[in-house]
Protein backbone atom coordinates (compact mmCIF):
# COMPACT_ATOMS: atom_id res chain seq x y z
CA UNK A 1 0.00 0.00 0.00
CA UNK A 2 1.38 3.41 -0.99
CA UNK A 3 1.25 6.14 1.66
CA UNK A 4 2.61 9.67 2.00
CA UNK A 5 4.36 10.31 5.31
CA UNK A 6 3.22 13.39 7.23
CA UNK A 7 5.78 12.95 10.02
CA UNK A 8 9.18 11.32 10.41
CA UNK A 9 8.79 7.61 11.07
CA UNK A 10 11.81 5.65 12.29
CA UNK A 11 13.28 3.28 9.68
CA UNK A 12 10.65 4.31 7.13
CA UNK A 13 11.16 7.91 5.99
CA UNK A 14 10.67 11.60 6.59
CA UNK A 15 7.97 14.17 5.83
CA UNK A 16 6.77 13.94 2.24
CA UNK A 17 8.23 10.55 1.37
CA UNK A 18 5.96 8.27 -0.60
CA UNK A 19 6.61 4.74 0.65
CA UNK A 20 5.16 1.28 0.28
CA UNK A 21 4.12 -0.39 3.53
CA UNK A 22 1.97 -3.37 4.43
CA UNK A 23 -1.73 -2.60 4.44
CA UNK A 24 -2.23 -3.48 8.12
CA UNK A 25 0.62 -1.21 9.24
CA UNK A 26 -0.89 1.67 7.29
CA UNK A 27 -4.50 1.10 8.37
CA UNK A 28 -3.83 0.24 12.02
CA UNK A 29 -0.91 2.52 12.90
CA UNK A 30 0.23 5.15 10.40
CA UNK A 31 -3.13 6.57 9.31
CA UNK A 32 -4.89 6.57 12.74
CA UNK A 33 -1.83 8.19 14.38
CA UNK A 34 -1.83 10.94 11.73
CA UNK A 35 1.62 9.96 10.50
CA UNK A 36 0.54 9.15 6.94
CA UNK A 37 -2.25 9.41 4.37
CA UNK A 38 -3.13 7.15 1.45
CA UNK A 39 -1.23 8.04 -1.72
CA UNK A 40 -4.20 8.87 -3.95
CA UNK A 41 -4.00 11.54 -6.64
CA UNK A 42 -6.13 13.92 -4.56
CA UNK A 43 -4.02 13.38 -1.43
CA UNK A 44 -0.78 13.88 -3.37
CA UNK A 45 -2.04 17.22 -4.72
CA UNK A 46 -3.32 18.24 -1.27
CA UNK A 47 -0.01 17.29 0.33
CA UNK A 48 2.04 19.28 -2.18
CA UNK A 49 -0.05 22.34 -1.29
CA UNK A 50 0.63 21.78 2.44
CA UNK A 51 4.26 20.60 2.17
CA UNK A 52 5.82 23.83 3.50
CA UNK A 53 3.40 23.93 6.44
CA UNK A 54 4.10 20.31 7.41
CA UNK A 55 7.88 20.71 7.08
CA UNK A 56 7.75 23.86 9.25
CA UNK A 57 5.69 21.96 11.84
CA UNK A 58 8.22 19.11 11.85
CA UNK A 59 11.13 21.55 12.22
CA UNK A 60 9.33 23.28 15.10
CA UNK A 61 8.76 19.96 16.89
CA UNK A 62 12.45 19.10 16.44
CA UNK A 63 13.64 22.44 17.83
CA UNK A 64 11.26 22.14 20.80
CA UNK A 65 12.62 18.66 21.55
CA UNK A 66 16.20 19.92 21.28
CA UNK A 67 15.39 22.74 23.71
CA UNK A 68 13.91 20.22 26.16
CA UNK A 69 17.01 18.02 25.79
CA UNK A 70 19.25 20.99 26.58
CA UNK A 71 17.15 21.77 29.67
CA UNK A 72 17.39 18.13 30.78
CA UNK A 73 21.17 18.17 30.29
CA UNK A 74 21.37 21.13 32.71
CA UNK A 75 19.43 19.32 35.44
CA UNK A 76 21.29 17.99 38.45
CA UNK A 77 20.69 14.40 39.53
CA UNK A 78 17.02 13.92 40.33
CA UNK A 79 16.38 12.34 43.72
CA UNK A 80 13.55 9.85 44.17
CA UNK A 81 12.92 8.41 47.63
CA UNK A 82 11.51 4.94 48.13
CA UNK A 83 11.34 2.36 50.89
CA UNK A 84 14.26 -0.06 50.78
CA UNK A 85 15.67 -2.94 52.78
CA UNK A 86 19.08 -3.13 54.41
CA UNK A 87 20.60 -4.82 51.36
CA UNK A 88 19.79 -1.86 49.09
CA UNK A 89 16.86 -3.44 47.26
CA UNK A 90 13.62 -1.49 47.02
CA UNK A 91 10.29 -2.69 48.37
CA UNK A 92 8.67 -2.30 44.97
CA UNK A 93 10.28 -0.37 42.14
CA UNK A 94 10.70 3.02 40.51
CA UNK A 95 8.95 2.90 37.14
CA UNK A 96 8.53 5.16 34.14
CA UNK A 97 5.61 7.04 35.72
CA UNK A 98 7.66 7.87 38.83
CA UNK A 99 10.59 9.05 36.72
CA UNK A 100 8.37 11.15 34.43
CA UNK A 101 6.71 12.82 37.43
CA UNK A 102 10.08 13.54 39.08
CA UNK A 103 11.58 15.08 35.92
CA UNK A 104 8.42 17.12 35.35
CA UNK A 105 8.56 18.34 38.96
CA UNK A 106 12.18 19.39 38.35
CA UNK A 107 10.97 21.77 35.64
CA UNK A 108 11.05 19.91 32.31
CA UNK A 109 7.78 18.41 31.07
CA UNK A 110 8.24 14.71 30.24
CA UNK A 111 5.58 12.08 29.58
CA UNK A 112 5.93 8.48 30.68
CA UNK A 113 6.00 7.30 27.06
CA UNK A 114 9.25 9.23 26.56
CA UNK A 115 11.09 7.40 29.37
CA UNK A 116 13.11 4.38 28.23
CA UNK A 117 14.00 1.66 30.74
CA UNK A 118 15.35 -1.24 28.64
CA UNK A 119 16.19 -3.37 31.70
CA UNK A 120 12.85 -2.69 33.36
CA UNK A 121 11.99 -0.69 36.46
CA UNK A 122 14.69 0.45 38.89
CA UNK A 123 14.83 -1.94 41.86
CA UNK A 124 17.98 -0.86 43.73
CA UNK A 125 19.10 2.30 45.49
CA UNK A 126 21.88 4.35 43.92
CA UNK A 127 22.41 6.39 40.76
CA UNK A 128 20.93 5.22 37.48
CA UNK A 129 21.28 6.66 33.97
CA UNK A 130 17.86 6.87 32.31
CA UNK A 131 17.37 7.61 28.62
CA UNK A 132 14.57 9.89 27.44
CA UNK A 133 13.36 9.61 23.84
CA UNK A 134 11.99 13.11 23.20
CA UNK A 135 11.76 13.00 19.40
CA UNK A 136 12.67 10.62 16.59
CA UNK A 137 16.03 12.40 16.33
CA UNK A 138 16.50 13.66 19.91
CA UNK A 139 17.46 11.60 22.95
CA UNK A 140 18.56 12.80 26.37
CA UNK A 141 20.04 11.17 29.45
CA UNK A 142 19.09 12.07 33.01
CA UNK A 143 20.64 10.79 36.23
CA UNK A 144 18.16 9.40 38.74
CA UNK A 145 19.38 8.98 42.31
CA UNK A 146 17.17 6.51 44.19
CA UNK A 147 17.57 6.89 47.96
CA UNK A 148 16.05 5.03 50.89
CA UNK A 149 13.42 6.75 53.04
Swiss-Prot record:
Tagged with keyword Ribonucleoprotein: yes
Disulfide bonds: none
Gene Ontology terms, MF aspect: rRNA binding; structural constituent of ribosome
Superkingdom of source: Bacteria
Keywords recorded for this protein, A-Z: Ribonucleoprotein, Ribosomal protein, RNA-binding, rRNA-binding
Keyword Cell cycle listed: no
A Gene Ontology BP annotation from the UniProt entry: translation
Gene Ontology cellular component terms for the protein in this record: ribonucleoprotein complex; ribosome
InterPro entries, per the entry: Ribosomal_bL9 (IPR000244), Ribosomal_bL9/RNase_H1_N (IPR009027), Ribosomal_bL9_bac/chp (IPR020594), Ribosomal_bL9_C (IPR020069), Ribosomal_bL9_C_sf (IPR036791), Ribosomal_bL9_N (IPR020070), Ribosomal_bL9_N_sf (IPR036935)
Pfam family membership, one: Ribosomal_L9_C
Similarity comment: Belongs to the bacterial ribosomal protein bL9 family.
Role played: Binds to the 23S rRNA.
Family matches, as PANTHER family: 50S RIBOSOMAL PROTEIN L9 (PTHR21368)
Name listed for the protein in its UniProt record: Large ribosomal subunit protein bL9
Native source species: Glaesserella parasuis serovar 5 (strain SH0165)
Amino acid sequence: MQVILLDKVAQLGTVGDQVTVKAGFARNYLIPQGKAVMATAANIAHFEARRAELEAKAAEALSAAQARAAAIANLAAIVITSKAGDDGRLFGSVGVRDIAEAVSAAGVAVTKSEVRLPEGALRTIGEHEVKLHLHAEVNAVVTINVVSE
